[in-house]
């Protein structure tokens, strides 16, 4: 007969009490080590926390409240892991073969979708399947998740599957709107789930999560899902790079998503959404903040989990619900900042001042600065920023907010702000905090502000010696230590090197003394230092911009390119230096003799270049095969007179001589004259 669990419970209770006593004695030491971030001793925390306290991690829910969907058996786990590997390799011969494989995986996963989504090893497979699924497959999977979303969005692994499902289904909602309601025949799947509308499925998700928004707002995993739903309902372009950090955290791996380097033109357009989404969006936003008082709402601004959700709420409110929404007393914006005048000592002014220096809250303040109505921004700038912009720019955190403020200033305000920031340039350079300086240069070029005072301040800060100046900007002493034929990577570079390189690139884009500061330094450094810059993955971008930007004169390009003589093959075989060699091609467009000399140097090293991956790219970009076989055509291409494409060169007509032009005029005159009638004799 089994024993009762009561006796074991008493032992566990006694042990728990002993552990608590030991914990109480060692609590001060733990607090000192962790600085009180993870100390949940109620006796110690009671005196510090207030009504606006939001714990970072709630106590885990009881196992009885969290449903368990079961585990995959070893054979199933092995099969799905193998399928995940095949999808990762993506070595299918045709798209039809891939679609058949995905259909087979779905058949094998029938009835096990929830197990796979909650599996640590197989949830990645679910994400990959979703990214390659058809509309009918998306609807079928969506329908099987309905009723379980409240639990799935809070799960560590299943929450990522939910996000992928929502992001994949969002574009099809727009397509469904454009289709005729009579078109219901789906050749891919005749299941009843194929006739479901994704619009209704999304509304079912909102209905399922309704009533739990207050808790999900600060839930570690569900908060990401809330952001995705808000953006989908608002019709935002989900492939916009600016939304990448809002949708997912920096730690999330982008599975099967192409990297977007620049913003697409279509990204600025809103997706068409059904009218029910607009109503659902307003209701969801109201439900998210209705039960929260102003104190709790402001506490979310500095909460690591709640802050990104608050950013999305604020951006959607100010961009999709109209600027007039900001005047509504019940709006998120007005509840955060109820005072319009922002007088000194007011509650709103104190709240905003605190956000300037908070590493989490400053991100919300950046969103407010970017999207706030013009009237509020002018009041905010004059009341809280104008007199303090110099001291704010010195701070590492507040400097990012200052950069956003500079982006909205007019020419006159930008000039006055620059005058207040100039005394702090020396301090900013010593601390390698170039964000404000970089933004000043960018906005000064756009607004047409005279940047010579800033150039003089940078000259004093970096040094009048051109060699020492480029060393201070790019931190070249680190390059000298690493210049030992060792593999370098941009991941190994320090933040100071990266920010210095970005500042130098920005200075090169400004015509006048700012670009001359960098150009003169590049001409003054030794050849070894110049080659080290060209081979560095971070600093080489400065050299590429110096060679290709319109601010570089032909005299500078002639002087800088001639220094690479004898080093072209060495640079062409380097992963970073090869990009500099490509930039030399563009820089020598009007310097054909220098370009020919470099081509001869590359031709002499043909075998090493062809054996190297980056070398083959340089060989192709310099059209060296054309240089070997058709030297005259290569010269025309080098001058920009002809295209490299042989088909274009064959269709190209050579210029007509004066004799050919005279013959053409005579032939045209003969055709326009009245033809003679010739009588035919029979």
From Swiss-Prot:
Compositional bias ranges of the Basic and acidic residues kind: 16-35, 250-272
Ranges of biased composition (kind: Basic residues): 1-15
Family assignment from sequence similarity: Belongs to the NOP9 family.
Keyword set includes rRNA processing: yes
Coiled coil: none
Name of the protein described by the UniProt record: Nucleolar protein 9
Positions of disulphide bridges: none
Subcellular location: Nucleus, Nucleolus
GO molecular function, one term: RNA binding
Pumilio repeats: 108-143, 347-382, 383-419, 524-562, 563-600
One of the GO biological process terms: endonucleolytic cleavage in 5'-ETS of tricistronic rRNA transcript (SSU-rRNA, 5.8S rRNA, LSU-rRNA)
Origin species: Blastomyces gilchristii (strain SLH14081)
One matching Pfam family: PUF_NOP9
Keywords: Nucleus, Repeat, Ribosome biogenesis, rRNA processing
Repeat recorded as keyword: yes
Main location: nucleus
Location of region: Disordered: 1-46, 249-272
Origin: domain of life: Eukaryota
Gene Ontology, cellular component aspect: 90S preribosome; nucleolus; preribosome, small subunit precursor
Function in brief: RNA-binding nucleolar protein required for pre-rRNA processing. Involved in production of 18S rRNA and assembly of small ribosomal subunit.
């Amino acid at each position: 007969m089994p024993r009762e669990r009561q006796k074991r419970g008493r032992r566990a209770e006694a042990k728990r009490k002993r552990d608590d006593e030991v914990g109480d004695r060692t609590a001060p030491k733990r607090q000192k080590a962790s600085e009180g971030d993870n100390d949940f001793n109620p006796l110690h925390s009671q005196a510090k926390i207030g009504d606006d306290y939001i714990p970072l991690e709630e106590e885990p829910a009881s196992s009885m409240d969290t449903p368990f969907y079961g585990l995959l058996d070893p054979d199933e786990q092995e099969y799905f892991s193998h399928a995940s590997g095949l999808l990762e390799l993506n070595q299918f011969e045709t798209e039809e073969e891939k679609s058949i494989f995905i259909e087979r995986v779905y058949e094998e996963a029938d009835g096990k979708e929830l197990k796979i989504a909650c599996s640590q090893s197989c949830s990645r497979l679910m994400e990959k399947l979703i990214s390659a699924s058809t509309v009918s497959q998306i609807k079928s999977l969506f329908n099987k998740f309905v009723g379980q979303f409240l639990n799935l969005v809070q799960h560590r692994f299943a929450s990522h599957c939910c996000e992928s499902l929502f992001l994949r289904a969002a574009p099809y909602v727009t397509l469904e709107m454009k289709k005729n309601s009579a078109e219901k025949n789906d050749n891919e799947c005749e299941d009843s789930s194929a006739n479901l509308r994704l619009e209704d499925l999304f509304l079912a998700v909102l209905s399922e999560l309704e009533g739990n928004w207050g808790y999900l707002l600060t839930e570690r995993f569900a908060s990401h899902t809330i952001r995705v739903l808000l953006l989908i309902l608002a019709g935002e372009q989900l492939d916009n790079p600016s939304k990448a950090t809002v949708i997912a955290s920096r730690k999330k791996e982008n599975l099967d998503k192409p990297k977007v380097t620049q913003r697409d033109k279509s990204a600025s357009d809103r997706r068409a959404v059904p009218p029910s989404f607009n109503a659902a969006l307003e209701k969801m936003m109201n439900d998210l903040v209705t039960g929260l008082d102003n104190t709790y709402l402001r506490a979310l601004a500095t909460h690591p989990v709640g802050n990104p959700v608050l950013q999305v709420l604020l951006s959607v409110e100010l961009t999709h619900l109209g600027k007039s929404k900001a005047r509504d007393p019940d709006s998120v914006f007005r509840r955060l900042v109820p005072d319009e005048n922002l007088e000194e000592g007011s509650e709103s002014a104190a709240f905003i001042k605190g956000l300037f220096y908070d590493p989490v809250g400053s991100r919300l303040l950046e969103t407010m600065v970017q999207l706030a109505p013009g009237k509020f921004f002018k009041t905010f700038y004059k009341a809280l920023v104008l007199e303090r912009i110099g001291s704010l720019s010195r701070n590492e955190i507040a400097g990012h907010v200052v950069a956003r403020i500079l982006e909205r200033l007019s020419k006159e305000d930008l000039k006055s702000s620059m005058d207040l920031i100039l005394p702090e340039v020396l301090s900013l350079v010593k601390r390698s905090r170039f964000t404000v300086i970089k933004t000043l240069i960018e906005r000064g070029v756009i607004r047409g502000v005279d940047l010579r005072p800033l150039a003089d301040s940078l000259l004093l800060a970096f040094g009048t010696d051109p060699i020492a100046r480029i060393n201070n900007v790019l931190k070249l002493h680190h390059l000298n230590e690493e210049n030992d034929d060792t593999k370098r990577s941009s991941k190994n570079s320090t933040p100071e090197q990266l920010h210095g390189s970005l500042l130098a690139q920005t200075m090169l884009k400004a015509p006048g003394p700012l670009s001359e500061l960098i150009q003169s330094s590049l001409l003054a450094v030794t050849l070894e230092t110049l080659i080290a810059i060209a081979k560095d993955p971070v600093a080489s971008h400065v050299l590429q911009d110096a060679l290709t930007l319109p601010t570089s004169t032909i005299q500078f390009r002639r002087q800088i390119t001639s220094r690479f003589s004898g080093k072209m093959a060495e640079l062409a075989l380097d992963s970073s230096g090869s990009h500099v060699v490509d930039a030399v091609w563009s820089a020598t467009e009007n310097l054909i003799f220098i370009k020919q000399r470099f081509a001869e140097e590359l031709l002499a090293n043909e075998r090493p270049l062809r054996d190297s991956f980056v070398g083959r790219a340089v060989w192709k970009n310099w059209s060296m095969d054309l240089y070997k076989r058709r030297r005259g055509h290569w010269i025309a291409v080098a001058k920009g007179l002809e295209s490299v494409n042989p088909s274009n060169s064959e269709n190209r007509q050579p210029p007509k001589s004066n004799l050919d032009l005279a013959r053409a005029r005579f032939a045209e005159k003969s055709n326009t004259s009245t033809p003679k009638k010739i009588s035919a004799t029979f």
